[in-house]
């Protein structure tokens, strides 16, 4: 995997970019002026980011794996230490499928009914492969989403959630908070 260098990152026109950021040269970005990227972030091949006016805020120590996408007009926040596994789709906008409206981004807006909302992904959240997160969702700190789940409602802190729609099935250990307290002071000068 080839990564964009510092000059290329600057030329992209992001709202902000931190240190030690590795973005594949095969990832695609739209609305870069609405995208903020923190420190120690890695974005893999074939990811697609399309930020509307709400923007996309990616905090520190984030990995977004191959073929994932973040798309929509609403605000998307990904908090520290979150992990987005491969083929995850996060939508801050969604169309209605009732048939009462047309759908498709090339149809004028007066004929469509697009809903946009915020998506907040808390610290230490992990989203499993192939999952979908819809608008107006909060994944509270430490929530885990199993592979191939569809998240359309909030997930409580330190719960494991699976299914279509995603529902909690168990609690998740908080041991990672102890590890964070040891890791954080030693993390200066990290290399992903």
Curated annotation (Swiss-Prot):
Lineage: Bacteria, Pseudomonadati, Pseudomonadota, Gammaproteobacteria, Enterobacterales
Entry's family note: Belongs to the transferase hexapeptide repeat family.
GO MF term list: acyltransferase activity
Its job: Catalyzes the conversion of dTDP-4-amino-4,6-dideoxy-D-glucose (dTDP-D-Qui4N) to dTDP-4-acetamido-4,6-dideoxy-D-glucose (dTDP-D-Qui4NAc).
Domain of life: Bacteria
UniProt protein name: dTDP-4-amino-4,6-dideoxy-D-glucose acyltransferase
Annotated signal peptide: none
Organism, as annotated: Escherichia coli
Catalytic activity: dTDP-4-amino-4,6-dideoxy-alpha-D-glucose + acetyl-CoA = dTDP-4-acetamido-4,6-dideoxy-alpha-D-glucose + CoA + H(+)
GO BP annotation list: lipopolysaccharide biosynthetic process
Involved pathway(s): Bacterial outer membrane biogenesis; lipopolysaccharide biosynthesis
Transmembrane segments: none
Keywords, comma-separated and alphabetical: Acyltransferase, Lipopolysaccharide biosynthesis, Transferase
Database matches in InterPro entries: Trans_hexapeptide_repeat, Trimer_LpxA-like_sf
EC number: 2.3.1.209
Name of the top EC class for this enzyme: transferase
């Amino acid at each position: 995997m080839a990564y964009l260098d510092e000059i290329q990152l600057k030329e992209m026109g992001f709202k902000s970019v931190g240190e030690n950021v590795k973005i594949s040269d095969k990832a695609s970005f739209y609305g870069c002026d609405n995208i903020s990227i923190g420190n120690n972030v890695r974005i893999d091949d074939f990811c697609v980011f399309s930020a509307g006016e709400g923007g996309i805020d990616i905090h520190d120590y984030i990995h977004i794996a191959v073929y994932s996408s973040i798309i929509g007009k609403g605000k998307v926040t990904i908090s520290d230490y979150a992990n987005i596994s491969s083929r995850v789709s996060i939508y801050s906008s969604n169309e209605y499928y009732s048939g009462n409206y047309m759908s498709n981004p090339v149809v004028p807006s007066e004929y469509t009914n697009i809903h946009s909302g915020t998506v907040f992904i808390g610290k230490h959240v992990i989203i499993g492969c192939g999952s979908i997160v819809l608008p107006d969702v909060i994944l509270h700190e430490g929530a885990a989403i199993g592979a191939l789940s569809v998240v359309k409602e909030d997930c409580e802190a330190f719960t494991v959630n699976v299914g279509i729609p995603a529902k909690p099935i168990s609690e998740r250990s908080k041991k990672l908070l102890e590890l964070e307290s040891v890791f954080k002071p030693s993390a200066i000068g990290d290399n992903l």
